[in-house]
């Protein structure tokens, strides 16, 4: 990755009722990264997001959490990108991924949204799918449960025991992306 400012976005839904749900793992990883940056989230009025400004892996980083619901998060992401003059190549979105087993972390550039409405909103608002993604596996729903219901459920007690470690590993993956770029970070992580 370049030495330009990076925009790292954790996806989730606002409000205490969503705080511990699978869909909010992006917010959880953003919290881990904010701790590493030594900062606290503050409202950025022009974008509709909460942000922390600081450094990670030797890079200037704007860490953001949209304050809108997941399916409307693109407006906040595009607003931050415009305000801080960050192009899509320097945006990393951290999000939950149904198609990966719980705790599996994968990095990718662009591609489809896989039914993820937060990614769809971001791609639409940025008018490109070519931004980096840190995908955090939450697993598939059991039986015939609707995936839309599953992502809004809390993690199981077994998963909760491992969640802090998963968030640390996802934060490590973001730092690898910032430091090494996609290919080298993928080689280390995958």
From Swiss-Prot:
Biological process annotations from GO: protein quality control for misfolded or incompletely synthesized proteins; rescue of stalled ribosome
Residues where tRNA binds: 18, 69, 71, 117
- What's this protein's family per the entry? Belongs to the PTH family.
Where exactly are the transmembrane stretches of this chain?
none
This protein's name: Peptidyl-tRNA hydrolase
Q: Which GO terms describe its cellular component?
A: cytoplasm
Which PANTHER family does the record match to this protein? PEPTIDYL-TRNA HYDROLASE (PTHR17224:SF1)
The record's catalysed reaction(s) read: an N-acyl-L-alpha-aminoacyl-tRNA + H2O = an N-acyl-L-amino acid + a tRNA + H(+)
Q: Name one GO molecular function term.
A: tRNA binding
Which residue positions are annotated as catalytic? Answer: 23
Q: What is its main location?
A: cytoplasm
Give compartment(s): Cytoplasm
UniProt site (Discriminates between blocked and unblocked aminoacyl-tRNA): 13
Q: Does the keyword Transmembrane helix apply?
A: no
Q: Which NCBIfam families match?
A: pth
Extract the InterPro entries matched here: Pept_tRNA_hydro, Pept_tRNA_hydro_CS, Pept_tRNA_hydro_sf
Gene3D superfamilies on file: Peptidyl-tRNA hydrolase
Task: Report the protein's function.
Answer: Hydrolyzes ribosome-free peptidyl-tRNAs (with 1 or more amino acids incorporated), which drop off the ribosome during protein synthesis, or as a result of ribosome stalling. Catalyzes the release of premature peptidyl moieties from peptidyl-tRNA molecules trapped in stalled 50S ribosomal subunits, and thus maintains levels of free tRNAs and 50S ribosomes.
Please provide the record's keywords in A-Z order. Cytoplasm, Hydrolase, RNA-binding, tRNA-binding
- Describe its assembly: Monomer.
Residue(s) at site: Stabilizes the basic form of H active site to accept a proton: 96
Question: What are its E.C. numbers?
Answer: 3.1.1.29
* Encoding gene, per UniProt annotation: pth
A Pfam short name? Pept_tRNA_hydro
């Amino acid at each position: 990755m370049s030495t330009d400012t990076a925009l790292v976005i954790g996806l989730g839904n606002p409000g205490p009722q969503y705080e511990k749900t699978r869909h909010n793992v992006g917010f959880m990883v953003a919290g881990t990264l904010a701790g590493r940056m030594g900062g606290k989230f503050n409202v950025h009025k022009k974008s509709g997001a909460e942000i922390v400004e600081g450094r990670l892996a030797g890079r200037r980083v704007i860490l953001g959490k949209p304050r809108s619901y997941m399916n409307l998060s693109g407006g906040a992401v595009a607003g931050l990108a415009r305000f801080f003059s960050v192009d899509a190549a320097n945006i990393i979105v951290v999000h939950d991924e149904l198609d990966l087993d719980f705790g599996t972390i994968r990095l990718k550039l662009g591609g489809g949204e896989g039914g993820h409405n937060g990614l769809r909103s971001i791609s639409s608002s940025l008018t490109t799918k070519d931004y980096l993604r840190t995908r955090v596996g939450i697993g598939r729903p059991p039986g015939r449960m609707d995936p839309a219901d599953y992502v809004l459920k809390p993690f199981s007690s077994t998963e909760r025991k491992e969640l802090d470690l998963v968030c640390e590993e996802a934060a490590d993956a973001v730092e690898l992306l910032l430091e090494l770029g996609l290919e080298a970070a993928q080689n280390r992580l995958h």
